[in-house]
A protein has these predicted regions:
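Alpha-helical membrane-protein topology signature
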Residues: 1-197
Length: 197
């Protein structure tokens, strides 16, 4: 087991990933889906507040950064003229389902059910960007998904209380970010595979 303070590595990793994503927004190569980024900033912050109240500490650093980074990107999407993705009905529908799951998460007094609804809320928030990454990989930048993943991996090595509410969100974010990165790099990955065959 690693020392708990190593979770602090997620702060510089998250900041670098965010800065590189914003740089790509200025270049026009990253256009965030505002529904995803708004809900990605909201759900982790609520989760941090709840888990902090239940005694979690160091394991919350990467989760906090999972909310802080999208919040910064969301703010910049209103500043940078070309820095956002045009929303469609599907995006709003996913947003509504995510908000419903967030509300259920907040009103349910059973920690494991609340945790499930938190993941469902984040999943619905992620779907529009996952679809966008796979259909339009040129509209996404992988840094904001790759670098924070390292912080979540470290987080799994510092957890002392192996309750699902402690480690589940980090595992979920690793899976979701991997799907996003594969979508963004799909043409490069598949092209290399086909040349090797």
């Amino acid at each position: 087991m690693l020392p708990a303070y190593l979770t602090l590595i997620s702060i510089p990793l998250g900041l670098v990933g965010t800065i590189l994503y914003i740089r790509d927004m200025y270049r026009g190569t990253a256009r965030p889906n505002r529904v995803s980024f708004f809900l990605w900033s909201l759900a982790p912050m609520i989760g941090v507040a709840i888990a902090f109240g239940e005694g979690a500490r160091w394991s919350l650093v990467p989760v906090f950064m999972a909310g802080f980074s999208p919040f910064v990107v969301l703010l910049f999407s209103f500043i940078i003229k070309q820095g956002y993705w045009k929303l469609k009905a599907f995006d709003y529908l996913c947003g509504i389902f995510s908000v419903v799951a967030l509300v259920l998460w907040l009103i349910i007094d059973v920690p494991i059910l609340a945790f499930v609804f938190a993941l469902v809320a984040d999943l619905f928030a992620s779907i529009p960007t996952i679809v966008k990454a796979w259909k339009h990989p040129e509209s996404e930048s992988a840094f904001i998904y790759l670098l924070p993943g390292i912080g979540h991996i470290v987080n799994l090595f510092v957890i002392t209380n192996w309750a699902i509410t402690e480690y589940g969100f980090s595992i979920y974010i690793l899976v979701a970010n991997t799907i996003l990165v594969l979508g963004i790099y799909q043409h490069r990955i598949w092209k290399k595979k086909s040349t090797l065959v």
